[in-house]
Every structure is written in C-alpha cells, then in structure tokens.
C-alpha cells in the first residue's frame, strides 16, 4: 500500500467536498467551494507512486458544489450544490467553460425543485433516476430523462446529509441530523423506477434510530440503570460535519451507516461507531465498527474479491454483534470508513481492519471514492487537498472476474453494469426510432389517402351527378346605375341630319356665300402713291 497527498491546487486551495470515479473510463471528478467541477486522470509513475493529471474544468454552478456523482454507466454526471442547484452533464465536444477552455463534457439539464442547499445525491440502477438530499429536511426523486422531480420523500426533522440507492432498486436510504436513518421502498407489484405507479407506492418502511442498551452492572438493583434500555444509534446535530453519507454494498446485501454512537451500558463512555446492517434485517446492526472520531462517509469498492483462506481470517467479535451474524458469501466486499481525520479499510469477512490511515490532512475529511478496478482509493478534505491510496492484490485480494461472481450479483460489477446501461440505452434508442418511423409512415399513409380521395372526386363520370358551384346573383339596380354613369362619361356618336330643299320662300333660306381668296401682300403690288395738292387757306 502506498499513500500520498497530492500537492496540486485541486480547487485553488479551497475545500474539496466530494470526489467520484467514472465507472466506464476511470476518470476522477472533484468539486468544492470554488464552484467548479474538475476532472482528473489518476495513475502511477515509474516507481508505482500515485500521480494525477488535470483534464477538464466544468463551470456552470453559481455557488459551492457539495457533491458530484457519475451515473452507473458513466455516461452522465450529476452535481449538487448550494441554493438547490442540481446540474446534469454528458459527454460532448465543442463546449467551452467560463475560462474559454474547451471541455469534453457539456451541461445537459438542470433539476429544479430544491430551494436550499443540496448535500448529497445518489443514482438509481441503470441511471434512470436519482435522489437528492437537502437542508430542507426532504429528498426528491428525479426522472433523469424528463429532468423533473417525481416524488418528494419527507419525514426528517433536520438536514438530510446523506442518501444512498439500493443497487437492486428496492430501497432508498436517507440519513439526517435528526439522529435517524429512513428506508423508503415501493411496495406491491413492481413498476419501473420513477414511474407514476412506482411513486404512488413509495413509503417509509423502516426508521433506524434506537438501539438496545445493556444494564449498568454497577447500578443498584431496582434502579433504571440496572435494567436494559434503549439508546440513540446516531449523533445529534452537534456533530461537526456537513455530511453523513451512507452506502450500499455493490451486491446490495449490506447497508453501512456512519455517524453512529454507542454505549455498552448507561454509565459507560460514548463511542463513535459505524453500523453494518444485513439486508432486510434492520432491527439491529449485524456489525458495529468502532472509530476514534465521528464517521462522515462510507464507500464500497465496486468490485468483488476472492475469499481468503480460513487460516488467514481473523475475527474480532463485538459486543453488539459478531461477524458470524454476517452470512457467508462466495466473495468478499471491501469498503472504507472515513472519519473526520482517519480512513479505515474493512472487508465483509472479518471485523479486523485491513488498513488504518491517519494524519493525512489538516482539516476534516469530506468524501472518498474507489477506482473501477478496486485498487485505488481517493480521499478528499476541507484543507483543499486529496490523498491517493493504492493497493496491491496481496493486500486486498484477487479481484473476481464476472464468470466467478454469482449470477444474481454479476450485474453489479462495473464492467457488466456499464455494458448493461449501454445496451439499455441502445434498446431505448431503437424503440424511439421505431416509434418515429411508425409515426412518419402513418402520416404518409394519411396524406396518400387524402390525395387519392381528392383525385377520385375530380374524375367522376360525365353522366354522373356533379356538384355545381353556386354563383352570386348580381343586383339589377346597382348594375343599371353603374351602366348609366359609364355612358355619361364616355364619348357619344352624333347621327347626321340630311339637308332637304326648302319648301316655301327661297329668300328665307340662307344662301351659300362663295369665299374670296385673300391676296398675298408679298406678291400683290402696292397702290401707287398719289400727290395731294394743297388747298389755299
């Protein structure tokens, strides 16, 4: 095992609040109070030491980003933050962030329903829906395809600080600062997740809040402390952490809840614990895992490991329960418990830790994530850094192939789950394409039938009945007035009147006077001048 706190500016020295691995590509996503989501490539150098390379920065949030989670198929990313922002991202080229840099992911949707901070979210199997937990004391189930809320889970009296979705699709888990864990389920005939009928049957099936408390052996007989009683299972809202992130094992057989507290008896000192419940047996924890400080999150490795030899297995019984209460499985599941300052790695075959890591960070741990191959663990912290822990096969065990895993849990392996999600998406696309083709064909047939009907009406036989289009009847008075006005303005022909001989006195009849030509002054000689003799006075 090698552990290293990577000295890079993950989010500009701001707190890193969540991390998650893409199950399909192995890409790491991180988010924090700088309002950005960053994508990294985690690898190992020539000496086997962990190293990271920055690949993308996604910018669309306007406030702190509290959680980021990839879908089970790795084809989508969901992020939740302050003021109720929940954004969906999908791979896409040609996009740029607010810094002007090209990105390989684009924002594909916004889920609007919360009015206050979202602390945690979890995807449903096959990525058809997701659930978010908010400081409004409620959770919302979202239909991812329609980008709308379909059901609100209520009942908590304080902030919802963690949620988890059963990989078998039956249970929804929410954990709150009110010291309770609630399990919701849709009972009755199975229906598709997030469908209207599924939502109609969802209700709270279990509330985990109280556990058994042993009698105080030092108490006087007959007193209250001398009798067994009940105690709270979880810390109250004075626990200094924004997150209480529960988790399901990849096979769905176990539920782990952090932020637990336990007393051996009424007079004993309170201990910090993490509870491991067996599926459908939530009345009491199967295993109680102690810690030095309050646990804030639990994360399971997505792979299954081969069982250890019986001689190599050691079991440390607990007062609450013994490891023998955990049913034997043909495989092992590995998980980590993160407290505010330590990381402890366990597997389901024993209660003795496989690894214990402390002193990684100067501030509280906020989240953790396992790589798809189950050999790398990344831990985030409020001090602005992330630590990478790498394991070998000799430390965790051999990872089983899909053929070695029981059939009923084979579908939860990362490579099988990614393939199943891809096939489901292809089937959905094929069905949608068939519907589009059927709609287009129906429209074409309808148009063809309408054209045929129109053509048949135009080719009726000559001796058959025909429809005569009515013609409007003109107003006779209006036509007459119009003609009169038109004739008044048009030129008229005057009929000639013949001239006849006058009957009677010829002198009374006007005579025709022959015209006389006027002499041309230019050609006519002027009369000769005459001398006028003067007359004597």
Where are these regions (language model features)?
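WD40/WD-repeat beta-propeller blade-loop signature
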Residues: 5, 12-15, 24, 54, ...
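Beta-strand-rich domains and repeat architectures in extracellular enzymes and scaffolds
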Residues: 9-33
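WD40-repeat beta-propellers
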Residues: 19, 37-42, 68, 86-91, ...
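Structural hallmark of WD40 beta-propellers
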Residues: 25-29, 74-78, 87, 109, ...
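Short C-terminal beta-strands that terminate individual repeats in beta-propeller domains
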Residues: 5-11, 47-60, 96-103, 107-113, ...
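Loop/turn segments within WD40 beta-propeller blades
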Residues: 19-25, 68-74, 122-127, 164-170, ...
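Conserved strand-to-loop turn within each blade of WD40 beta-propeller repeats
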Residues: 30-36, 73, 79-83, 91, ...
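Terminal intrinsically disordered, low-complexity extensions flanking WD-repeat/beta-propeller proteins
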Residues: 188-244, 249, 263, 267-272, ...
């Amino acid at each position: 095992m090698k552990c290293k706190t990577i000295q890079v500016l993950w989010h500009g020295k701001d707190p890193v609040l969540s991390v998650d691995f893409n199950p399909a590509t192995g890409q790491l996503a991180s988010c924090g109070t700088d309002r950005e989501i960053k994508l990294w490539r985690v690898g190992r150098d020539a000496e086997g030491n962990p190293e990271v390379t920055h690949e993308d920065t996604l910018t669309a949030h306007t406030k702190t980003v509290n959680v980021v989670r990839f879908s089970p198929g790795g084809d989508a990313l969901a992020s939740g933050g302050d003021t109720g922002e929940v954004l969906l991202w999908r791979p896409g080229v040609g996009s740029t962030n607010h810094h002007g840099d090209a990105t390989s992911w684009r924002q594909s949707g916004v889920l609007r329903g919360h009015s206050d901070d979202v602390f945690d979210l979890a995807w449903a199997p096959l990525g058809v829906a997701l659930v978010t937990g908010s400081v409004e004391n409620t959770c919302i189930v979202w239909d991812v395809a329609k980008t709308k809320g379909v059901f609100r889970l209520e009942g908590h009296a304080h902030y919802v600080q963690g949620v988890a979705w059963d990989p078998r699709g039956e249970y929804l888990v929410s954990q709150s600062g009110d010291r309770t864990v609630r399990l919701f389920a849709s009972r009755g005939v199975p229906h598709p997740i997030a469908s209207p009928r599924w939502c109609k049957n969802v209700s709270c099936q279990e509330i985990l809040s109280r556990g058994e408390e042993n009698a105080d052996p030092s108490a006087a007989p007959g007193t209250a402390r001398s009798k067994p009683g009940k105690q709270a299972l979880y810390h109250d809202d004075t626990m200094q952490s924004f997150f209480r992130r529960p988790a399901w094992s990849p096979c769905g057989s176990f539920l782990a809840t952090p932020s637990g507290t336990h007393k051996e008896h009424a007079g004993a000192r309170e201990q910090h614990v993490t509870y491991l419940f067996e599926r459908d047996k939530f009345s009491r924890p199967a295993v109680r895992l102690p810690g030095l400080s309050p646990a804030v999150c639990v994360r399971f490795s997505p792979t299954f490991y081969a069982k250890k030899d019986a001689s190599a297995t050691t079991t440390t019984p607990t007062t609450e329960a013994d490891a023998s209460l955990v049913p034997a499985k043909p495989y092992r599941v590995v998980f980590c418990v993160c407290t505010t300052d330590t990381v402890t790695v366990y597997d389901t075959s024993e209660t003795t830790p496989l690894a214990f890591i402390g002193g990684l960070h100067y501030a509280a741990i906020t989240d953790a994530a396992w790589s798809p191959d189950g050999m790398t663990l990344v831990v985030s912290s409020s001090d602005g850094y992330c630590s990478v822990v790498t394991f070998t096969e000799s430390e965790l065990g051999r990872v089983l192939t899909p053929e070695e895993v029981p059939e009923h849990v084979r579908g939860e392996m990362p490579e099988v789950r990614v393939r199943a999600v891809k096939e489901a998406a292809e089937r959905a696309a094929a069905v949608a394409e068939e519907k589009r083709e059927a709609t287009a064909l129906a429209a074409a047939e309808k148009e063809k039938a309408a054209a045929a009907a129109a053509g048949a009406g135009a080719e009726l036989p000559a001796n058959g009945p025909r429809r005569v289009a009515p013609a409007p009847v003109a107003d006779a008075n209006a036509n007459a007035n119009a003609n009169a006005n038109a004739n008044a303005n048009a030129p008229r022909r005057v009929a000639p009147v013949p001239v006849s001989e006058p009957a009677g006195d010829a002198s009374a009849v006007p005579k025709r006077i022959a015209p006389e030509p006027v002499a041309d002054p230019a050609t006519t000689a002027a009369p000769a001048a005459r001398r006028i003799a003067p007359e004597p006075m």
